[in-house]
Amino acid sequence: LKIALPLEENVHKFKENKWTVFEYPKVLKKIKTVFDWREYPEDFKEQWYEYINEEFRRREEGFWYINKDKPTYITGTHYMYLQWSKIDVGQPDFREANRLFFIFWTAVHADARCYGMCYLKNRRSGFSFMASGVTVDMATISSDSRFGILSKSGADAKKMFTDKVVPISVNYPFFFKPIQDGMDRPKTELAYRVPASKFTRR
C-alpha cells in the first residue's frame, strides 16, 4: 500500500531536535468555552486569531517537523493526540509506530471503498488512548453523528469512556470544543449539542 504524504513545507524545528509539546498560552487557558471568548474585547481576540487559525490548519493538514535531524510528517489527528490529548501519564510521547498507525488510519478513513481496519496489537501499546483520541477528534468536527465504543463487556466500554475519552475531551482548548450539553465529566455520553430549553407560556 502506497500512501502519499503532503509536500514537505514549513518544517518546524524544535530546540530538542524531537517532538515537543507547544506551550498553551496562559491567558487562553483561562478561557473555558466559546461563550467566555465572546466576552473578551475585540483587540484581545485579534492578538490570538493567528495562533488559533494555525492550530486549525495543523489539525486539518498535519504537521512537518524535524525529528532527530530527519523531516517527519504527522497527520492532523496525530497532532491532536500529541499536542492536546491527556493520557494516564500526562502528555503522550512520540512513537514511530504510532505515527505509522495514524498515517494508515487516515488513509483508511479517506478511502470510501474501505470498511475499516484490523489492527493486531500488543499490550501497553497505547492503542486505547489513540483510538480514544481519534474518537474525540472526529466527534468534535462532525455534525449529526454518533460515535460508539465496542468492547468485550459493557463495563470495559464504560471504563474506556470515563478514563480515556472524557479526559481527552476535557483537555481540548476552548476553540476546539463544541457546545456541550450536560456535565463536564459525564458517565455515559458526551453530547456536543446546544442544551435543551423549556417552552414557556407568556
Where are these regions (language model features)?
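Phosphate/NTP-binding elements of NTP-utilizing enzymes
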Residues: 1-202
